Amino acid sequence: MKRDRLGRFLSPGSSRQCGASDGGGGVSRTRGRPSLSGGPRVDGATARRAWGPVGSCGDAGEDGADEAGAGRALAMGHCRLCHGKFSSRSLRSISERAPGASMERPSAEERVLVRDFQRLLGVAVRQDPTLSPFVCKSCHAQFYQCHSLLKSFLQRVNASPAGRRKPCAKVGAQPPTGAEEGACLVDLITSSPQCLHGLVGWVHGHAASCGALPHLQRTLSSEYCGVIQVVWGCDQGHDYTMDTSSSCKAFLLDSALAVKWPWDKETAPRLPQHRGWNPGDAPQTSQGRGTGTPVGAETKTLPSTDVAQPPSDSDAVGPRSGFPPQPSLPLCRAPGQLGEKQLPSSTSDDRVKDEFSDLSEGDVLSEDENDKKQNAQSSDESFEPYPERKVSGKKSESKEAKKSEEPRIRKKPGPKPGWKKKLRCEREELPTIYKCPYQGCTAVYRGADGMKKHIKEHHEEVRERPCPHPGCNKVFMIDRYLQRHVKLIHTEVRNYICDECGQTFKQRKHLLVHQMRHSGAKPLQCEVCGFQCRQRASLKYHMTKHKAETELDFACDQCGRRFEKAHNLNVHMSMVHPLTQTQDKALPLEAEPPPGPPSPSVTTEGQAVKPEPT
């Protein structure tokens, strides 16, 4: 006997007859062992995994033509899910029964990967000849493991432990059929505020355009992953599928959207146009979360309604079911028309549910919100219904906390506030005195800058600076004194203006004294009699009146007024008694006393006479 590349026995006429390849494949599964019936047995699974039709000898798979000849089977293939390359022994067909299913008695409830994949994920598997019709053993086992787990979870998540169905007491009892299972699960149908809100919204939108009264038409069975759906509609053909388990379907939608299914634009023109609208036609367009009516699902139709039945398996896996899921709520449609009103999108379903539940559970939610506000900063992993709002609140709280902590932790660089006062106190306690180093100069300064300026002006740059204006014979030894003289005497620049009367002044101190007249302020006051004045010169002149006459050595011989200094007496005589002073100068020289020793009471050069003390 000859063997092929995989070690399978070939019949003597396999190289010439095309039909013998299947038989040889069947023998290879037994590896030459005789069957129980005594003859060669053809393996059903191997026949179903044939790489082409029975009558086509030269049909090659995706990997190319057969190298060994036209009669040999293709050795390699790709997995539809993981896209890996495997041998024919490691591949399973996507349209065969699940492992462990009975081959002699194929029941109606047997699992097929194409149908189960659409029921679990809501995405139909396209029967495209360009795509591989096989999956590997690993992907096949993982899929059905997840399928059984998710199906059990969906059936238990909204059911109480008391409402579960009791297991069959008899060992040989048959499991309930799909109709009986749907009837048992009718009691487990639960409704949420979101579900009722969507139904009420559809009823109101439907009443605006249609006069027929909607009513319950049928209940879809729980074969579709345990999700029970109720179809409402009117006699005009408008229908609405109420999803009683949106949370579970949202989980399925998220897992389905994780794989980015490309939109096939070529299949859009191939959609049938003559068929009426039915929620079972296209699972992706009839449901709000992209999980449509299962293929072959059993329905319970009320006797007063006339609704089209869901399509067969061949229709479900056709081009119509190849579109990606659409994340939108059910639409109100009529035959040949678009939806009249679209309900809120799935992104706002959770918010609508929360707002709707707040109306009935206000007290409980208020306590929960208070607890959340108190423990907002305790855990970052706690669930919040509005994560986008909570993130912004956490950011603002963290910024405020940082701002409050910054002045306590951070220290500004440089000296601390109040360092100038400390220096002043130290200077007052131990004053530094700078004395002029030049001999005969008694100038004293508290700062080094003042001493340097004094030495420069009075000792180093000492020279005569005459006034440049003609007719002015004044001479200054310091330059800044000369500039001040020129500004005040020889120029008419008045930069200081009174705001009250508009009078102008050359110096700022003159303006300040003038403004005291408008305000009436007299900051200077005599300590003896309380006399008030504005200028220091006025106060000094006033204080001379309070001195005793004995302290004033110089007296006027005309009016008897006394002065402290001889210069003040001369000024008084020249301004008050000018005639008497000129008459004294006009006396003839012969009137002068004869030469002799000068008396102590007479002075030369017209000096004032100082009387002797009596």
Swiss-Prot record:
Does this UniProt record's set of keywords contain Flavoprotein? no
Q: Where is the composition biased (Basic residues)?
A: 409-420
Q: Name one GO biological process term.
A: regulation of transcription by RNA polymerase II
Q: Where are the zinc fingers (C2H2-type)?
A: 434-458, 465-490, 496-518, 524-546, 554-577
| Main location class | nucleus
* Annotated ZAD domain residues: 77-163
Write out the biased-composition intervals (Pro residues). Answer: 591-600
Cellular component terms (Gene Ontology): chromosome; kinetochore; nucleus
Checking Pfam families in the record gives: zf-AD (PF07776), zf-C2H2 (PF00096)
Q: Per the record, where are the segments of Acidic residues compositional bias?
A: 357-369
Q: Where is this region: Disordered?
A: 1-50, 268-420, 583-614
Q: What keywords are annotated for this sequence in UniProt?
A: Centromere, Chromosome, DNA-binding, Kinetochore, Metal-binding, Nucleus, Repeat, Transcription, Transcription regulation, Zinc, Zinc-finger
Basic and acidic residues biased stretches: 386-408
Question: Where does the UniProt annotation locate this protein?
Answer: Nucleus; Chromosome, Centromere, Kinetochore
Q: Which residues bind Zn(2+)?
A: 79, 82, 136, 139
The reply on keyword Zinc-finger is yes
Q: Name one GO molecular function term.
A: sequence-specific double-stranded DNA binding
InterPro entries cross-referenced by the UniProt entry: Znf_AD, Znf_C2H2_sf, Znf_C2H2_type
Record function comment: May be involved in transcriptional regulation.
This chain belongs to the protein called: Zinc finger protein 276
What does the organism's lineage look like at the top?
Eukaryota, Metazoa, Chordata, Craniata, Vertebrata
